[in-house]
Swiss-Prot record:
It comes from Bacteroides thetaiotaomicron (strain ATCC 29148 / DSM 2079 / JCM 5827 / CCUG 10774 / NCTC 10582 / VPI-5482 / E50). Monomer. This is Glutamate--tRNA ligase. ATP binds at K263. A motif ('HIGH' region) lies at residues 12-22. The gene is gltX. The keyword Aminoacyl-tRNA synthetase applies.
Length: 504
C-alpha cells in the first residue's frame, strides 16, 4: 500500500454512557494519530434509532473534553468529509447499496421475522447463506417483475450481502498478525433495511471509512469476527487498494480476569466504569471518574497501560511522552485485567506531580462544603505539606482539617496515652514560652522550644505529644512546628489554652 496520511476515527453509538473500554480505544486512536501527524475523526454511528438515548452524544463529547482527547474533525468539529452523523448520510448509503445490487454483490430479501424464525425451527443451525438463500423469498429466487411489484406495494425488505462460499478471507491485523477465516461460516449479512431507510453498521462503517479516507481502523477485539465481512465488502466495492489496516485491541477484563469488564463489576467492587457520572432518564445514577475525584491525567495514564507496554519500566508518563512512545505493535493480544487499585495509585502519583496551587484550587470546593474560608496562600501551604498522604483531593480534608478548624473534642485514646499528669502544667509553661517567641518561623520556634525543653529537663516526646494533642485533637499530623507555623502564634496559643481547660 502506498504511503498515505494517517487518518483514524472513533465512532461511538449514542446509546448511553461511554464505557471506559471505549475511552481506551479512543485514546489509542488519538496517540496513533498524533504520533504520525495524522487526523482523528469523531463520527456518530446512530443507524439504530431504537437504541438512541437523548444526551448520550453530548455526554461522550464532554467526556473527551475533560480527558484532553482532542478531535480534528467530525460531529461538532466540522470538516471536509461530513456529515459525520450516520443518520444524516441516508442518500449516500442508498447510492452504495444500489452499486452492490447492480453488480450482483447483494440482493433484496422479503422474508419476514416470522418466516426466518420458522426456518430456524425447521433447520438446525440455520443461517442465511449460499446454501439456504435459494429456498427463501428474495430477488435471487423471484423474477424482477415480482420484486418490483412488492416494492411498489410498500412491502418491507432488507438488502443482504451475497457472500460466495468456501473462500479463505485474509485479515492482516497489526496486533494479531494474519487472521484467516473461511467465508462458509459467514452468513449473508443484512446491509440495509427499507423500514427506516438506513444501513446496518457494517455497510455504513465501510462506506464512511472509505469516503473519509480512513487509513487505520483501531477498534476493540469484539469486532474481529466482523473483519472478514468488512474485507469482503471492500473487495465488492473494488476498494482493496485503499482498504485501511486493522488493529483489534485486547478486551478489558474483570479485575479477577474471568470475563469482560462490566458496570456490575464496578458496582460490586466500588469503582467507576464511566468517565463522567451518568444520569439517564431512568434515574439510576452511575458514578464517573471525574466525580469520584480522579484527575484526567491519571485516568489517561492508567488506561494507556491496560493492554499496551511502552517497552520500558516507566509507568507515569505525560500525554506527550505517551505519543512519543506509543507503538500499536506493542499492544497485547490477550485481555488486560482492570486493576482498579492501580488507577488509585496513578491518581496519587498525579496529585504529587501537580503544582500545589492547582491542587489547592481543586481543594477549595471541599473546604467550602465544610464551611471553611481560608486565605489561598494558606491552602497552598497546607496542600504542599499534606498531599503526599492522599490519593484523592477530597481525602485532604480528613488529613488536614485541623489546619482550618480547631478541635471540638480530643481523641480519647490519644488523651489516655499521651496526656500525662503534668501535661496541663507543662503546656501552660510552653504557652508562655511560645508567646515570647519573636521569630515564629519553623526554625525559630524549634530552637526556642527545644532549648526550653533541654533547660527544664523535660522528656521531649511527652512535651511534643501533648503539644500535638492541643493543636490537632489527636496524635496525627506533620512536623509539630509546621503545624504551629501555619496556624500562627495567636491561634496556637488559643488552642493550647482551650485544651488545658478541657483536659486538666
Amino acid at each position: 500500500m502506498a504511503e498515505r496520511k494517517v487518518r483514524v476515527r472513533f465512532a461511538p453509538s449514542p446509546t448511553g454512557a461511554l464505557h471506559i473500554g471505549g475511552v481506551r480505544t479512543a485514546l489509542y486512536n488519538y496517540l496513533f494519530a498524533r504520533q504520525h501527524g495524522g487526523d482523528l475523526i469523531f463520527r456518530i454511528e446512530d443507524t439504530d434509532s431504537n437504541r438512541f438515548v437523548p444526551g448520550a452524544e453530548e455526554y461522550i463529547l464532554e467526556s473527551f473534553k475533560w480527558l484532553g482527547i482532542h478531535f480534528d474533525e467530525g460531529v461538532s468539529f466540522g470538516g471536509e468529509h461530513g456529515p459525520y452523523r450516520q443518520s444524516e448520510r441516508r442518500e449516500i448509503y442508498k447510492k452504495y447499496v444500489q452499486i452492490l445490487l447492480d453488480n450482483d454483490k447483494a440482493y433484496i430479501a422479503f422474508d419476514t421475522p416470522e418466516e426466518l424464525d420458522a426456518k430456524r425451527a425447521e433447520i438446525a443451525n440455520f443461517q442465511y447463506d449460499a446454501s439456504t438463500r435459494g429456498m427463501m423469498r428474495n430477488s435471487l429466487t423471484m423474477s424482477k417483475e415480482e420484486v418490483d411489484a412488492l416494492i411498489a406495494e410498500g412491502k418491507q425488505y432488507v438488502v443482504r450481502f451475497k457472500i460466495e462460499p468456501n473462500e479463505d478471507v485474509h485479515v492482516n491485523d497489526l496486533i494479531r498478525g494474519e487472521v484467516v477465516i473461511n467465508s462458509s461460516i459467514l452468513d449473508d449479512k443484512v446491509l440495509y433495511k427499507s423500514a427506516d431507510e438506513l444501513p446496518t453498521y457494517h455497510l455504513a462503517n465501510i462506506v464512511d471509512d472509505h469516503l473519509m479516507e480512513v487509513s487505520h481502523v483501531i477498534r476493540g477485539e469484539e469486532w474481529l469476527p466482523s473483519a472478514p465481512l468488512h474485507v469482503l465488502l471492500y473487495r465488492a466495492f473494488g476498494w482493496e487498494d485503499t482498504m485501511p489496516e486493522f488493529a483489534h485491541l485486547p478486551l478489558l477484563l474483570k479485575p479477577e480476569g474471568n470475563g469482560k469488564l462490566s458496570k456490575r463489576d464496578g458496582d460490586r467492587l466500588g469503582f467507576p466504569v464511566f468517565p463522567l457520572e451518568w444520569r439517564p432518564e431512568s434515574g439510576e445514577v452511575s458514578s464517573g471518574y471525574r466525580e469520584s475525584g480522579y484527575l484526567p491525567e491519571a485516568v489517561i495514564n492508567f488506561l494507556a497501560l491496560l493492554g499496551w507496554n511502552p517497552g520500558n519500566d516507566q509507568e507515569v508518563m505525560s500525554m506527550d511522552e505517551m505519543i512519543k512512545l506509543f507503538d500499536i505493535h506493542r499492544c497485547s493480544k490477550s485481555g488486560a485485567k482492570f486493576d482498579y487499585k492501580k488507577g488509585i495509585w496513578f491518581n496519587h502519583q498525579y496529585i504529587q506531580l501537580k503544582p500545589n496551587e492547582e491542587i489547592a484550587e481543586l481543594f477549595l470546593p471541599v473546604l467550602k462544603e465544610h464551611g471553611v474560608e481560608a486565605p489561598f496562600e494558606k491552602v497552598v501551604t497546607v496542600v504542599g505539606m499534606m498531599k503526599d498522604r492522599v490519593s484523592f483531593i477530597k481525602e485532604l480534608w480528613d488529613v488536614c482539617s485541623f489546619f482550618f478548624v480547631a478541635p471540638a473534642e480530643y481523641d480519647e485514646k490519644t488523651v489516655k496515652k499521651r496526656w500525662k499528669e503534668d501535661s496541663a502544667k507543662c503546656m501552660t509553661e510552653l504557652a508562655e514560652v511560645i508567646a515570647g517567641i519573636e521569630d515564629f518561623s519553623i526554625e525559630g520556634q524549634e530552637k526556642v522550644v527545644m532549648d526550653w525543653i533541654a533547660e527544664k529537663g523535660y522528656h521531649t516526646g511527652n512535651i511534643m505529644n501533648a503539644f500535638r494533642l492541643t493543636l490537632v485533637g489527636e496524635g496525627k499530623g506533620p512536623h509539630m512546628f509546621d503545624i504551629s507555623w501555619v496556624l500562627g502564634k495567636e491561634e496556637t496559643l488559643a488552642r493550647m489554652k482551650r485544651a488545658v481547660e478541657v483536659l486538666k
